Protein backbone atom coordinates (compact mmCIF):
# COMPACT_ATOMS: atom_id res chain seq x y z
CA UNK A 1 0.00 0.00 0.00
CA UNK A 2 1.45 3.33 -0.94
CA UNK A 3 0.35 6.94 -0.72
CA UNK A 4 1.23 8.71 -3.97
CA UNK A 5 0.82 12.11 -2.30
CA UNK A 6 2.26 12.04 1.24
CA UNK A 7 2.11 15.23 3.26
CA UNK A 8 5.12 17.20 4.50
CA UNK A 9 4.52 18.21 8.13
CA UNK A 10 7.11 20.84 9.15
CA UNK A 11 6.03 20.69 12.83
CA UNK A 12 6.31 16.88 13.12
CA UNK A 13 9.41 16.38 15.25
CA UNK A 14 12.33 18.79 15.42
CA UNK A 15 12.94 19.12 11.68
CA UNK A 16 9.62 18.00 10.17
CA UNK A 17 8.61 14.71 8.58
CA UNK A 18 6.73 13.08 5.72
CA UNK A 19 3.40 11.48 6.68
CA UNK A 20 1.49 8.95 4.61
CA UNK A 21 -2.16 8.18 4.98
CA UNK A 22 -2.85 4.55 4.06
CA UNK A 23 -2.26 1.29 5.96
CA UNK A 24 -2.22 -2.12 4.32
CA UNK A 25 -4.96 -3.22 6.74
CA UNK A 26 -6.88 -1.00 9.17
CA UNK A 27 -9.03 -2.59 11.84
CA UNK A 28 -11.28 0.17 13.19
CA UNK A 29 -14.30 -0.15 15.53
CA UNK A 30 -14.32 -3.92 14.99
CA UNK A 31 -14.58 -6.88 17.35
CA UNK A 32 -13.75 -10.58 17.06
CA UNK A 33 -11.25 -10.20 14.22
CA UNK A 34 -8.75 -12.87 13.14
CA UNK A 35 -5.90 -11.94 10.76
CA UNK A 36 -4.16 -15.17 9.81
CA UNK A 37 -1.59 -16.48 7.27
CA UNK A 38 -0.82 -13.28 5.35
CA UNK A 39 2.36 -11.65 4.06
CA UNK A 40 2.76 -7.89 4.46
CA UNK A 41 5.75 -6.18 2.83
CA UNK A 42 6.91 -3.14 0.88
CA UNK A 43 8.32 -4.81 -2.19
CA UNK A 44 7.77 -2.51 -5.14
CA UNK A 45 8.46 0.82 -3.39
CA UNK A 46 10.68 0.10 -0.41
CA UNK A 47 11.48 3.00 1.92
CA UNK A 48 15.21 2.92 1.23
CA UNK A 49 14.51 3.35 -2.51
CA UNK A 50 12.74 6.69 -1.99
CA UNK A 51 14.43 10.06 -2.70
CA UNK A 52 15.17 12.63 0.00
CA UNK A 53 13.32 15.93 0.20
CA UNK A 54 13.66 18.57 2.95
CA UNK A 55 16.39 16.42 4.47
CA UNK A 56 14.09 13.42 5.03
CA UNK A 57 13.42 10.31 3.00
CA UNK A 58 10.13 10.59 1.11
CA UNK A 59 7.66 8.38 3.01
CA UNK A 60 4.95 6.70 0.92
CA UNK A 61 4.00 4.02 3.48
CA UNK A 62 2.16 4.15 6.77
CA UNK A 63 1.48 1.05 8.85
CA UNK A 64 1.20 -2.52 7.63
CA UNK A 65 -1.52 -3.27 10.18
CA UNK A 66 -3.21 -0.75 12.50
CA UNK A 67 -5.79 -1.74 15.14
CA UNK A 68 -7.56 1.38 16.41
CA UNK A 69 -10.78 3.11 17.47
CA UNK A 70 -12.07 0.80 20.21
CA UNK A 71 -11.40 -2.41 18.28
CA UNK A 72 -11.37 -5.42 20.58
CA UNK A 73 -10.66 -9.15 20.70
CA UNK A 74 -8.29 -9.23 17.73
CA UNK A 75 -5.94 -12.13 16.96
CA UNK A 76 -2.99 -11.73 14.58
CA UNK A 77 -1.43 -15.14 13.89
CA UNK A 78 0.93 -16.92 11.51
CA UNK A 79 1.67 -13.79 9.42
CA UNK A 80 4.88 -12.43 7.94
CA UNK A 81 5.67 -8.72 8.27
CA UNK A 82 8.72 -7.76 6.20
CA UNK A 83 10.81 -4.85 4.93
CA UNK A 84 8.83 -2.05 6.56
CA UNK A 85 9.46 0.70 9.10
CA UNK A 86 6.31 1.47 11.13
CA UNK A 87 4.82 -1.99 11.24
CA UNK A 88 1.84 -2.20 13.60
CA UNK A 89 -0.01 0.34 15.72
CA UNK A 90 -2.49 -0.75 18.38
CA UNK A 91 -4.45 2.22 19.75
CA UNK A 92 -5.43 5.50 18.17
CA UNK A 93 -3.42 8.20 19.94
CA UNK A 94 -2.37 9.35 23.40
CA UNK A 95 -5.48 11.54 23.43
CA UNK A 96 -8.01 8.75 22.71
CA UNK A 97 -9.14 7.53 26.16
CA UNK A 98 -12.22 5.95 24.57
CA UNK A 99 -9.85 3.08 23.69
CA UNK A 100 -9.71 2.15 27.40
CA UNK A 101 -11.22 -1.29 28.14
CA UNK A 102 -10.84 -2.19 24.45
CA UNK A 103 -7.86 -3.16 22.29
CA UNK A 104 -7.40 -6.66 23.71
CA UNK A 105 -5.10 -8.15 21.08
CA UNK A 106 -3.11 -11.39 20.74
CA UNK A 107 -0.08 -11.70 18.46
CA UNK A 108 1.28 -15.22 18.05
CA UNK A 109 3.47 -17.21 15.66
CA UNK A 110 4.27 -14.22 13.43
CA UNK A 111 7.55 -13.46 11.67
CA UNK A 112 8.78 -9.85 11.84
CA UNK A 113 11.58 -9.84 9.27
CA UNK A 114 13.51 -6.64 8.61
CA UNK A 115 11.01 -4.30 10.27
CA UNK A 116 12.19 -1.07 11.87
CA UNK A 117 9.79 -0.47 14.74
CA UNK A 118 6.24 -0.86 16.10
CA UNK A 119 5.94 -4.61 16.26
CA UNK A 120 3.66 -3.53 17.94
CA UNK A 121 3.39 0.04 19.29
CA UNK A 122 0.57 0.06 21.87
CA UNK A 123 -1.59 2.79 23.41
CA UNK A 124 -4.36 1.89 25.89
CA UNK A 125 -4.32 -1.76 24.79
CA UNK A 126 -3.72 -5.05 26.54
CA UNK A 127 -1.59 -7.13 24.19
CA UNK A 128 -0.34 -10.71 24.56
CA UNK A 129 2.74 -11.26 22.37
CA UNK A 130 4.02 -14.84 22.26
CA UNK A 131 5.95 -17.28 20.05
CA UNK A 132 6.92 -14.66 17.46
CA UNK A 133 10.23 -14.37 15.62
CA UNK A 134 11.96 -10.99 15.22
CA UNK A 135 14.77 -10.95 12.67
CA UNK A 136 16.97 -8.04 11.56
CA UNK A 137 20.35 -7.50 9.92
CA UNK A 138 22.66 -4.60 9.12
CA UNK A 139 20.39 -3.59 6.21
CA UNK A 140 17.44 -3.12 8.56
CA UNK A 141 16.88 0.32 10.07
CA UNK A 142 15.94 -1.38 13.35
CA UNK A 143 14.87 0.85 16.26
CA UNK A 144 12.69 -1.25 18.56
CA UNK A 145 10.23 -4.12 18.59
CA UNK A 146 7.67 -3.26 21.26
CA UNK A 147 6.51 0.18 22.28
CA UNK A 148 4.39 0.51 25.41
CA UNK A 149 2.62 3.87 25.37
CA UNK A 150 -0.16 5.52 27.36
CA UNK A 151 -1.96 3.11 29.73
CA UNK A 152 -0.84 0.06 27.77
CA UNK A 153 0.10 -3.43 28.88
CA UNK A 154 2.24 -5.87 26.91
CA UNK A 155 2.62 -9.44 28.15
CA UNK A 156 5.42 -11.00 26.11
CA UNK A 157 6.64 -14.58 26.34
CA UNK A 158 8.65 -17.08 24.30
CA UNK A 159 9.61 -14.68 21.51
CA UNK A 160 12.86 -15.17 19.58
CA UNK A 161 15.17 -12.34 18.48
CA UNK A 162 17.90 -12.75 15.86
CA UNK A 163 19.99 -9.63 15.27
CA UNK A 164 22.12 -11.34 12.62
CA UNK A 165 25.17 -9.22 11.87
CA UNK A 166 24.09 -6.09 13.80
CA UNK A 167 26.89 -5.20 16.23
CA UNK A 168 25.84 -4.59 19.86
CA UNK A 169 25.61 -0.93 20.84
Predicted segments with their positions:
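Extracellular low-complexity, O-glycosylation-prone Ser/Thr/Pro/Gly-rich "stalks"
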Residues: 166-169
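Right-handed parallel beta-helix
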Residues: 1-14, 29-46, 50-64, 70-92, ...
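Short acidic (Asp/Glu) patches
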Residues: 17-21
Amino acid sequence: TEDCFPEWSPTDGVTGNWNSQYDSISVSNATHVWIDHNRFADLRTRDEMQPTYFGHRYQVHDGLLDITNESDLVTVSWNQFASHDKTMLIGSSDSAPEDREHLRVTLHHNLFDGVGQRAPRVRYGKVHVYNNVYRADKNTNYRSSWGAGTESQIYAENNFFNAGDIPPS
